[in-house]
Amino acid sequence: MINSSIYSGQVVHKRFKPKIHYFKYNVFSLLIELSELNQLDKKVNLFSYNRFNLVSFYDKDHGDRDGTSLIDWVNKNLKKNKISTENIRIKLLCYPRILGFVFNPLSVFYVYDQSEQLIAILYEVKNTFGEQHTYIFRVEKDNSLIQNSCSKKFHVSPFIEMKCNYFFRILKPGNKISVIIDQYDSEGKILFASQEGVRTDLNSKYLLKSYIKHPIMTFKIILAIHYEAFKLWVKGIKFIKKNIKIKNNITTEN
């Protein structure tokens, strides 16, 4: 039995200041149980693992981004933070490659123990400069709604200052997914961002349906980012220069 799944839904962003800006796009994501990748490669006709296909997943798109095992990467970082890795299961919510291309602004690793309790969450954030930052949170209480907060440590948008705080609210994946991020500065809320989706099985039939609905989704994501940035610039929102160059940073937040 395959536990990995497809979630079809929407991404929403609303900026509150200095000017209101709103957009919404239809997307689909995969929630991949990392231990199933080889099985998915064999059983799902349109999906490949670390090789080209209509839809594919590559280890080098996440973690250390050097093609090494993501399970090993998660285990390594959990051990550094004294989080148990005994009999854990790891699921990753992300966009897949479509026709060999992907850009994931946010990927979420969900780590479960042998009792199916959520014990850690890793938020992996990327920007369009090829950089990545991962925020690691220990889950102290496994509720259906998980809430985390931290200061912003990574340059994402050139239209938002670094002196901000993130507030994450996520539902444990089930029939639906929900990932919500509120961003605040000292004067109040700047940005609301969310991804919502409804679950279907990850198999050849539903993957083909998802592709037909979104044949150029991953290309559209990167184009949409630049298009929305252009609209912010036209609205006169200040462009903030980026000074520090990083590759893969990781911070522990609790």
Go through the PLM ranges and name each one.
Residues 1-254:
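Mature, function-bearing regions of proteins
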